[in-house]
From Swiss-Prot:
Keywords: Cytoplasm, Cytoplasmic vesicle, ER-Golgi transport, Golgi apparatus, Membrane, Phosphoprotein, Protein transport, Repeat, Transport. GO terms for biological process: endoplasmic reticulum to Golgi vesicle-mediated transport; intra-Golgi vesicle-mediated transport; intracellular mRNA localization; intracellular protein transport; retrograde vesicle-mediated transport, Golgi to endoplasmic reticulum. Oligomeric complex that consists of at least the alpha, beta, beta', gamma, delta, epsilon and zeta subunits. The complex interacts with ARF1 and PAB1. This is Coatomer subunit beta. It is found in: Cytoplasm; Golgi apparatus membrane; Cytoplasmic vesicle, COPI-coated vesicle membrane. The keyword Cell membrane does not apply. PANTHER family: COATOMER SUBUNIT BETA. HEAT repeats lie at residues 98-133, 134-170, 279-317, 318-354. One of its GO terms (molecular function) is structural molecule activity. The modification Phosphoserine is found at S181, S540. One of its GO terms (cellular component) is Golgi membrane. The N-terminus is blocked.
Length: 973
């Protein structure tokens, strides 16, 4: 018998009977006996699905031989050969089943059939057979098919020769000579390709000889043959390094002449595997770039770009000259393709080409302004801005021009993109102090166009921290004064509203004159009206008037007093700085007086009903604190120590904190770059390959990265599995019912990426045969039962095994439940055994992920489902709870460790992020503190996701943490 690994594997792509109806072998036998060809086709499909689900049904073989095999229906014959592929051909003792003799006669008859498609289909079936006893009788017919007139037959005949030799060499001892003679005489390119595949694996010398004979005309060969030549060269070059130089030269020639996209892709990848020389890599990658630009399929573009990214990661610095060529891919409309191309170009960018990259991206940025598809253009614009920011931060010579470029677009951007530009300006000013004055001036000039309050708050912070000289402070102050508008704000707005109302009354002609007079209240008194009680004032303000207001005035009247609090801090910073750089008391006093007027005006309008939302307590406290500081400054008895303390709090602390944050980010970036570079550093004890000794040491063979990727794609993580995997399976065995039940059941649960597999074992614990025993499963949540177990009979104390696959479509909490059903004795009603519920662990589908602050906030605002969980835990520290939360939810911490505080801190707040295997995003915000009375950890965890299920599932995991950590203490008995 052949080994298990050599057996073919099958995947059920589509179930033609989704009604979940189950049929017994008797039902199938009756359908085959009496049905027409069309009914037999449906029956055969059901039989194939049932067999692929794990029920071999060997008792059907004779019925299929009798009632299906004689049919002339082409579709039925095609299904019949599918059945021959999967039917058990050996008996329990390992010998060939007697019925297969009849099958062999039918197969031999089809191998001599006058219809070439039946012959070809039969030969293709033979390539999947692994039983030497069956194949032995087919050899003469297969050899006869090698000379058939139709190429469709010959292409499968040569593959059948190859596969028969692989199963058993003694069946075709001269297979190498047969294939070699066939390929020399053959004219059809597909037949040649199939023959060369077999020759390359069985007879390397003859394959190399055939390649040498066709080298001169390789550019004129069929692309199919060129592709297998490239595959042979890539594999043989690793085995025989002496020929590598000649192979590379041949591949370079083929790459420059071929027009087939498939051959270009394979040849370019083969060159990158065989050589790390930039003279070889650059032309190869250039061809890949041309391919990515030319093809229309976005999936192919992404595959090609992924390969280019891998090549650059393995050969750092070799592809720098292709930076601008990569950006040609930006002509694609797909945002993912553009993002991938920009990422690669940033990896390739250097100080030599940074200016050209920025110029090209600037042109792309300008094209987004007039794009009719505004949503897509806005996303692409944000992507371009993010890339340009990266260039400017990395290369100082581009920073100044990039800042002015981005500031030109800041008025057209949404809040996220605009605030991103301001954050970038903060970083540039801190990193490159020589650009401070120029950047500050440009920023102040463009702030009138800013529509985002968040971006404007960042700009206010920059003005307060980096305005140094007297002229700079006055320039910033002038902008603030103009941005506030006419003060006092309350009186000027009331005046404007009154004028608008009078103008409206003059132009309106009321059809029915209504008496006007004072309003009399129910208690008989006259009503009075104050500016603080105006409710309808906002109705008199049009959208045009609201948009025409200067920025700070617009934010204040719309109820954004957080910006007003930032403005108050900025004003204090500017006043303190101006006192240090100027001795002009008149100007200083004028600044303080104007500052007091602005801040008091903001407080008064914030307490009125003119604003859309009244001022909150926190903002009011911060503004009033600033007013108190300004009033204290007027006091001549103020001590120098108090002034010094004030300057430290406002001028030194925040700036030094931001500087430290930049340094930490720089260190982390350096660590990541060092970690990435270490992947390509070879250890000092790596063996050196000498061509002269290649024949002596055959074990020193270079790894083929393409073959490794292929194995990883086919086997997944199984290629890394160790012998301990069988032991770890014991942990996944779950009892489905108890030992006292008439049928004992247990399941080994295996979680794959998109499904859960239950290997179920049933044990008949009675002394009777259980007839028509079957298991019914059902699910709760986003789970779907793919396989339906068939009915079976289980002898006394007998065993029955079957496999059930459950499709998982999301990371929601899922439950699998069911029962065992079997017939009662002597015609009694069916009996049931209720099974325990199986809970699908969602943690197997959730992995930690990373995201920048900008992306996190965007998702947080977009996601509509929120689950807020109260936290009360007896863990000793806040950091201990955070560790338990990360362990229990598989989420990654986004907040830098420096911002989390010490282990004994009394307050902790951080953001967490994870992605599921299905592409779902899960966001979390943790806000906890130490209760001063009970010393417990208290607070909240807020979880957001696009769907409700994931938020609830993670909420259950958070609640489970509290149950595990809160232990009841036994105080007395």
């Amino acid at each position: 018998m052949t080994s298990l690994s050599s057996q073919p594997a099958y995947t059920l792509v589509f179930d033609p009977s989704p009604s979940m109806e189950t049929y017994s072998s008797t039902d199938f036998q009756k359908a085959l006996e009496k049905g027409s060809d069309e009914q037999k086709i449906d029956t055969m499909k059901s039989i194939l699905v049932t067999m692929l689900e794990g029920n071999p049904m060997p008792e059907l073989l004779m019925h299929i031989i009798r009632f299906v095999m004689p049919s002339k229906n082409k579709e039925l014959k095609k299904l019949l050969y599918f059945y021959w592929e999967i039917v058990p051909k050996l008996a329990e003792d390992g010998k060939l089943r007697h019925e297969m003799i009849l099958v062999c006669n039918a197969i031999q008859h089809d191998l001599q059939h006058p219809n070439e498609y039946i012959r070809g289909n039969t030969l293709r079936f033979l390539t999947k057979l692994r039983e030497a006893e069956l194949l032995e009788q087919m050899v003469p017919s297969v050899l006869a098919c090698l000379e058939y007139r139709h190429a469709y037959v010959r292409k499968y005949a040569i593959l059948a020769v190859f596969s028969i030799f692989k199963v058993s060499e003694h069946l075709l001892p001269d297979a190498k000579e047969i294939i070699n003679s066939f390929i020399v005489a053959e004219t059809d390119p597909i037949c040649k390709r199939n023959a060369f595949i077999g020759l390359a694996e069985l007879d390397r010398e003859n394959a190399l000889h055939y390649l040498e004979n066709n080298i001169a005309d390789i550019e004129n060969l069929d692309p199919l043959l060129q592709a297998v030549f490239v595959q042979f060269i890539r594999q043989d070059a690793n085995r025989t390094p002496a020929l590598k130089a000649q192979y590379i030269e041949l591949l370079m020639e083929l790459l420059s002449t071929t027009t087939s996209d498939e051959v270009i892709f394979e040849t370019a990848l083969a060159l990158t595997v065989l050589s790390a020389n930039p003279n070889v890599l650059v032309p190869a990658v250039n061809k890949l770039i041309d391919l990515a630009v030319k093809v229309s399929d976005n999936n192919i573009k992404l595959i090609v770009l992924d390969r280019i990214q891998d090549i650059n990661a393995n050969n750092v610095g070799a592809l720098e000259e292709l930076t601008l060529d990569i950006l040609r891919v930006l002509n694609a409309e797909d945002l993912d393709v553009r993002s991938k191309a920009l990422d690669i170009s940033m990896d390739l960018a250097t100080s030599r080409n940074a200016e050209d990259v920025v110029q090209l991206l600037k042109k792309e940025l300008q094209t987004t302004v007039n794009n009719p598809d505004q949503d897509k253009a806005m996303q692409y614009r944000q992507l371009l801005i993010k890339t340009i920011r990266t260039v400017a931060v990395n290369f100082v010579e581009m920073a100044a021009s990039v800042v002015s470029l981005l500031l030109d677009f800041i008025g057209d951007l949404n809040s996220v993109a605009a605030s991103g530009i301001i954050a970038f300006i903060k970083e540039v000013i801190e990193k490159y102090p020589q650009l401070r004055a120029n950047i500050l001036e440009n920023m102040v000039q463009t702030l009138d166009k800013v529509r985002s309050a968040k971006a404007y708050r960042g700009a206010l912070w920059i003005m307060g921290e980096y305005a140094e000289g007297e002229s700079e402070i006055q320039h910033c102050w002038k902008h603030i004064r103009n941005s506030v508008g006419e003060v006092p704000i309350l009186q000027s707005e009331i005046k404007k509203l009154t004028q608008n109302q009078e103008h409206t009354e003059e132009n309106e002609v009321d059809a029915t004159a209504k008496p006007t007079g004072p309003v009399i209240l129910p208690d008989g008194t006259y009503a009075t009206e104050s500016a603080f009680d105006v409710k309808t004032s906002q109705k008199s303000v049009t959208d045009e008037e609201r948009d025409s207001r200067p920025p700070i005035r617009r934010f204040v009247l719309s109820g954004d007093f957080y910006t007003a609090a930032i403005l108050a801090n900025t004003i204090i910073k500017l006043v303190l700085k101006f006192e240090n750089v100027s001795k002009n008391k008149t100007v200083i006093n004028a600044l303080k007086a104007e500052a007091l007027l602005i801040l008091v005006s903001i407080v008064r309008v914030g307490q009125s009903s003119l604003v859309e939302k009244k001022i909150d307590e926190d903002s009011l406290e911060r503004v009033m604190t600033s007013i108190s500081i300004l009033l204290d400054e007027v006091n001549p008895e103020e001590k120098k120590e108090e002034v010094k303390l004030l300057e430290v709090a406002f001028l030194d602390t925040t700036k030094s904190s931001f500087k430290r944050q930049i340094e930490i980010a720089k260190k982390n970036k350096h660590k990541r770059a060092l970690k990435d570079s270490c992947k390509n550093i070879e250890p000092i004890d790596t063996p050196i390959s000498f061509r002269q000794f290649a024949g002596v040491d055959s074990t020193n063979v270079q790894k083929d990265s393409i073959e490794e990727d292929l194995q990883l794609a086919m086997k997944g993580d199984a290629i890394h599995a160790t012998s301990s995997s069988s032991i770890s399976k014991l942990k996944k065995i779950v009892p489905l019912c108890g030992f006292s039940d008439p049928v004992y059941a247990e399941a080994c649960i295996t979680n794959n990426q998109f499904d859960v597999v239950l290997d179920v074992l049933l044990v008949n614990q009675t002394k009777e045969t259980l007839k028509n025993l079957h298991v019914q499963f059902a699910t709760l949540g986003d789970l779907k039962i793919i396989d339906t177990p068939q009915k079976t009979n289980v002898i006394p104390h007998g065993f029955h095994k079957f496999t059930v696959t459950v499709k998982v479509s999301s990371a929601d909490t899922g439950v699998i439940f069911g029962n065992i059903i079997y017939d009662g004795a002597h015609g009694e009603d069916a009996r049931y055994v209720i099974l325990n519920d199986v809970h699908v662990d969602i943690m197997d589908y959730i992995k930690p992920a990373t995201a920048d602050d900008e992306h996190f906030r965007t998702m947080w605002n977009a996601f509509e489902w929120e689950n807020k969980i109260s936290v009360k835990s007896q863990l000793p520290t806040l950091h201990a709870y955070l560790r338990e939360l990360v362990k229990g939810t598989n989420m990654g911490i986004l907040t830098p460790s420096e911002s989390l505080g010490e282990d004994d801190c009394r307050f902790l707040s951080c953001n967490l992020y994870a992605k599921s295997s299905f592409g779902e995003d899960a966001l979390a915000n943790l806000c906890i503190e130490k209760d001063s009375k009970t010393n417990d950890v208290i607070g909240y965890v807020r979880i957001r996701s696009k769907g409700q299920g994931l938020a609830l599932s993670l909420g259950d995991r958070v609640a489970l943490i509290a149950k595990k950590t809160n232990k009841l203490a036994l105080t007395h008995v």
